[in-house]
């Protein structure tokens, strides 16, 4: 599907700080993501990626500024916003003592789906994500890659218009990483806006149309990957990060 001029995400003059100044701080942050876009937010550990996503989803409350998702004001705790977005956190969101089916039934009901919608959607997701053979096993028995697939299924159970993913491929094998990325690409082809974070800059290529680099709570640049590398005459985002910040990009900080 082609990109729309409509904004999926519009953040203006965002201000936020953790009590006691513990953690990243935002001051006057602005960010726009178009509807139907594959958008990647990249930065080292501690840069503010997870905090920004938590503000987008309403898990954290901003001190100042505006956050709108498809025109809805996140700060007003509008229930419609919850139906629009799916969130796949870095920390697992499932109940480990339950099976994939039981988890999807619970989160599907929480999202307001009917029993028939839950059954249809559960069967579909278990098939797509390769979980059919373990549909009734407890999730705590799964490998890390299988757990990531369950986490993703929960995030998309209600067919959200915007899917927000925080490090969805962290700690998985190559096969699972490819399976997750391929599924995300398919969702985007059907119109889902993807907002994706990672500290692995190599994942930007092929997945994200637009990328932003964030460091210490500040978005230092945002554009298409091709434009960024061409404009700054760099071969990689790591080199671009070094040019713009004067710091070597590290994944372990």
What does each model-identified segment do?
Residues 57:
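Helix-to-loop junction immediately C-terminal to a conserved catalytic motif
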């Amino acid at each position: 599907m082609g990109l729309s001029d409509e904004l999926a995400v519009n953040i203006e003059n965002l201000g936020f700080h953790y009590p006691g100044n513990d953690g990243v701080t935002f001051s006057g942050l602005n960010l726009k993501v178009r509807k139907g876009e594959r958008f990647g937010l990249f930065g080292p550990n501690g840069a503010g990626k997870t905090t920004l996503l938590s503000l987008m989803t309403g898990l954290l409350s901003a001190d100042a500024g505006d956050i709108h998702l498809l025109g809805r004001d996140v700060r007003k705790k509008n229930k419609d916003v919850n139906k629009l977005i799916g969130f796949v956190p870095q920390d697992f969101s499932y109940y480990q003592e339950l099976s994939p089916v039981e988890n999807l039934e619970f989160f599907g009901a929480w999202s307001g789906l009917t029993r028939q919608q839950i059954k249809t959607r559960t069967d579909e997701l278990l098939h797509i994500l390769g979980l059919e053979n373990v549909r009734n096993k407890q999730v705590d028995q799964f490998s890390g890659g299988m757990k990531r697939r369950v986490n993703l299924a929960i995030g998309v159970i209600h067919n959200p218009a915007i899917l927000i993913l925080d490090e969805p491929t962290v700690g998985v094998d190559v096969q699972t990483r490819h399976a997750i990325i391929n599924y995300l690409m398919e969702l985007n082809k059907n119109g889902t806006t993807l907002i994706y974070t990672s500290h692995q800059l190599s994942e930007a290529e092929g997945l994200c149309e637009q990328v932003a680099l964030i460091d210490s709570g500040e978005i230092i640049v945002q554009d298409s990957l091709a434009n960024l590398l061409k404009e700054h005459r760099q071969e990689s985002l790591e080199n671009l990060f070094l040019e713009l910040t004067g710091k070597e990009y590290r994944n372990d900080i």
